[in-house]
């Protein structure tokens, strides 16, 4: 049930924001139709990283990933970055033709940088365009009434994608009148 109108939503959790020194610890993906109805969800994948990689996390990552249980899931995982990339790519291919969907999410440019470096096959499969929900959030702050979508910010990849989709629906109704 591939469709060029379907959208690819991805969220990553990482050991930090520096693409040159940090690694991906979790990936999740959701496919929606163009009206933002969820078609399918890929289970989030914790990606194994050795202790020396985890030891280099900043304070925010240590606190957050410990509280969510991600750090332990990463330590216990048997899944490599390459295996996680392959699983997510197989999921995406079921629903979206090659280079037909923009990569969607919040501050998605940051995720895209990590995909380009560590999961280049996913990066290449997505269209070069990106649908960044953060743009609408900022436009609402600058030109709207300032009332923004309230997020739970669980920093769990699948939860974050679901929130991004809900946030885009919120801003679509509020700002776009379409």
Swiss-Prot record:
EC number: 3.1.15.-
SMART domains: EXOIII (SM00479)
Family matches, as Gene3D superfamilies: Ribonuclease H-like superfamily/Ribonuclease H
Domain Exonuclease: 7-168
Pfam families assigned: RNase_T (PF00929)
Location(s), subcellular: Cytoplasm
Membrane spanning residue stretches: none
Top-level taxon: Bacteria
Record bears the keyword Hydrolase: yes
Protein keywords: Cytoplasm, Exonuclease, Hydrolase, Nuclease
Gene Ontology cellular component terms for the protein in this record: cytoplasm
Active site location: 128
GO terms of biological process kind: DNA metabolic process
Alphabetized GO MF terms: 3'-5'-RNA exonuclease activity; nucleic acid binding
Function: 3'-to-5' exoribonuclease specific for small oligoribonucleotides.
Membership in a protein family: Belongs to the oligoribonuclease family.
NCBIfam families reported for this sequence: PRK05359.1 (NF003765)
Protein name (database record): Oligoribonuclease
Upper classification of the organism: Bacteria, Pseudomonadati, Pseudomonadota, Gammaproteobacteria, Thiotrichales
């Amino acid at each position: 049930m591939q469709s060029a109108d379907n959208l690819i939503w991805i969220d990553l959790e990482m050991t930090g924001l520096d693409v040159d020194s940090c690694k991906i610890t979790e990936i999740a993906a959701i496919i929606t139709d163009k009206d933002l109805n969820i078609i399918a969800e890929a289970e989030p994948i914790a990606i194994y990283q050795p202790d020396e990689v985890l030891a280099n996390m900043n304070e925010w990552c240590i606190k957050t990933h410990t509280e969510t249980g991600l750090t332990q899931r990463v330590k216990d995982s048997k899944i490599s970055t390459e295996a996680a990339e392959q699983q997510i790519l197989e999921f995406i291919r079921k629903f979206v033709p090659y280079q037909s969907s923009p990569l969607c999410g919040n501050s998605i440019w940051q995720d895209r940088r990590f995909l380009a470096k560590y999961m280049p096959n996913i990066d290449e499969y997505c269209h070069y365009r990106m649908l960044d929900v953060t743009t609408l959030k900022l436009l609402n702050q600058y030109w709207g009434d300032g009332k923004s979508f309230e997020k739970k910010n669980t920093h769990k990849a699948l939860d974050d994608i679901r929130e991004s989709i809900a946030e885009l629906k919120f801003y679509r109704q509020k700002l776009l009148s379409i």
